Amino acid sequence: MIIDQRALGFGSGERAVFASDPWTTRGRLFPEAGSLTRSEFQRDRDRIVHTTAFRRLKHKTQVFISPDGDHYRTRLTHTIEVAQIARALARALKLDEDLAEGVALVHDFGHTPFGHTGEDALDAVLLPYGGFDHNAQSLRIVTKLERRYAEYDGINLTWETLEGLVKHNGPLVNAKGEGIKGPVPLPILEYCVLQDLEIGSYASLEAQVAAIADDIAYNTHDIDDGLRAGYLTFEMLEEVPFLSKLMAEVRGKYPVLDKERFANEIMRRQITHMVEDVIGVAQQNLARLKPQSAADIRAADFTVATFSPEMAETDRQIKKLLFGHIYRHPEIMRIRAGATQIVTDLFHRYMETPAEMQSHYWVDSISGMSVAAKARHVGDYLAGMTDSYALRAHQRLFDHTPDLR
């Protein structure tokens, strides 16, 4: 991919005309005085980092549940890696780096314990009450469940950050108002009554680079963790031509290299190639679109920051590799079954006996709720658990807890 370096931003502070402007933000649900020392998007990023939800990411699984090593990624380390890539993309494209980083930092807040397995289990038990969606849960956390301020629930983020959180993967509804990937989660619809996030349009370019940064990070780093865990071998990586080419390049430059450094050199090159591909495609799309404002990005009928067709095919091949050798590995499937049982058991126990929830706030506030509201309340409590907390809760309440090691 050819990149016009003259068109790149290298931290000079210059913003493109299509970048989001923190000084003309659409504001916050609850109006506040501005800061003398920080932009509105800087304040958002800082608020996100200081939440309890951000701290809990440290003990939530990315892929490997209860791993036997300290070097596997958690939701927190993954989030930090996504934020770094998003910020690099934003700088190169002359976007607002703080907004891109903020969306990246908050994008996984709604994830349950035990990764996507926990989300699937919680979605299944909550299906009669609207189901569970981690993006919608992220929105609930930052607009309702975080209790830090005297004047409101949530952390009162700007419209742009909330929009990016909800729409970083694209519009949620089509021109007819129909859900593009199924019904729009109820928490998103409820919030849009208070503050319209315009879920039928694309998000800002800052949100788009956060989304593609997520793809780059988890593809690359799941390979790294898979190699460490022994689920992947270098021979398996040869199945993907792009990775095979990178391996040949590293071997040619460093004929004698230990396995750990060899893997790191592959990962470094993979990230670099993918980032440069996105920058090149975005530049081409911007030249075609000729946007004069952030609104022009939202009004476009396509994603501006994305992979080229060739890199998209590589992305597909990598996902196939990961699904075949890691996500559907018999040992991972065994652990996933145990995690599903833990989440399901806890949900039904708390629905039957809310007093088992070890928090005065969660127990006291459930009084008088309808069954649907009670289920959502229990779902909020479960979704906020870390892996270790959920395990301990199950061990306390049940005679047998699945072994997730």
UniProtKB/Swiss-Prot annotation:
CDD domains: HDc (cd00077). It comes from the Bacteria. SUPFAM superfamilies: HD-domain/PDEase-like (SSF109604). Keywords: Hydrolase. It holds the Pfam family HD. One of its GO terms (molecular function) is dGTPase activity. One of its GO terms (biological process) is dGTP catabolic process. Gene3D superfamilies: Hypothetical protein af1432. Residues 75-219 form the HD domain. Belongs to the dGTPase family. Type 2 subfamily. This is Deoxyguanosinetriphosphate triphosphohydrolase-like protein.
